[in-house]
Amino acid sequence: MAILLVMALIMFSLDKCYSTDDKCEDSLRREIACAKCRDRVRTDDYFMNVAHLNLHLKSVRRCCTNDLHCFLRYKTSEM
């Protein structure tokens, strides 16, 4: 009986792992996008302080604010 219980737990954990695989990939893609966004925000701050390149800043802000979750996550982590 204990062996059946252990086997059921193993099968349940494997099934749970495989069923959440897509969510994990989406999360990984989101993390990569956030990293790119974070780099662009840093570039944005650099150019704002150094050269005032308005066209560059507008394109950077548009990219980052399109993914509002990412943008807010990065900005709140700085505080």
Curated annotation (Swiss-Prot):
Signal sequence region: 1-19
UniProt keyword annotation of Disulfide bond present: yes
Source organism superkingdom: Eukaryota
Keyword presence, Lyase: no
A GO CC term assigned to this protein in UniProt: extracellular region
Major subcellular site: secreted
Tissue expr: Expressed by the venom gland.
Post-translational events: Contains 3 disulfide bonds.
Keywords: Disulfide bond, Secreted, Signal, Toxin
Subcellular localization: Secreted
GO molecular function: toxin activity
Family of the protein in this entry: Belongs to the scoloptoxin-03 family.
Name of this chain's protein: U-scoloptoxin(03)-Sa1a
Source organism per UniProt: Scolopendra alternans (Florida Keys giant centipede)
